[in-house]
Amino acid sequence: MARVKRGNIARKRRNKILNLAKGFRGGNKNLFRTANQRVMKALCNAYRDRRRRKRDFRRLWIARINASARINGTNYSKLINGLKTSEIIINRKMLAQLALNDPQSFEKIVSAVSK
């Protein structure tokens, strides 16, 4: 059986982790053990927060729609119910964009729904 020396493979593996740890503070970017722990934690956080981002943006859109709807004399739940009953198909992201960037169009939608 031939002798296997893992020098190149081990260095590659460590450098891969240390490259992922660039930008971390202190020994977390230089020392392999701590860098490995920090990278694993960072990847866990990234996985979790990719799912959380969807929730956070939906909450932001709803808050923006509600604020603009209240300015126009209704509230969020009545506006969404009116959109459903009048069969206007527009999602919350588009509604929030309209409320923020084009208040006149948003006002027309609210008036069309509240009739």
UniProtKB/Swiss-Prot annotation:
Keywords for this protein: Ribonucleoprotein, Ribosomal protein, RNA-binding, rRNA-binding
Q: Which Pfam families match?
A: Ribosomal_L20
User: One GO CC term of this entry?
Assistant: ribosome
| Gene Ontology molecular function terms on file | rRNA binding; structural constituent of ribosome
GO biological process, any: ribosomal large subunit assembly
Function according to Swiss-Prot or TrEMBL: Binds directly to 23S ribosomal RNA and is necessary for the in vitro assembly process of the 50S ribosomal subunit. It is not involved in the protein synthesizing functions of that subunit.
Q: Which NCBIfam families does the record match to this protein?
A: rplT_bact
Q: Which family does it belong to?
A: Belongs to the bacterial ribosomal protein bL20 family.
Show the PANTHER family listed in the entry.
Answer: 39S RIBOSOMAL PROTEIN L20 (PTHR10986)
Q: What is the protein name stated in its UniProt record?
A: Large ribosomal subunit protein bL20
Q: Which organism is it from?
A: Prochlorococcus marinus (strain MIT 9515)
Name of the coding gene: rplT
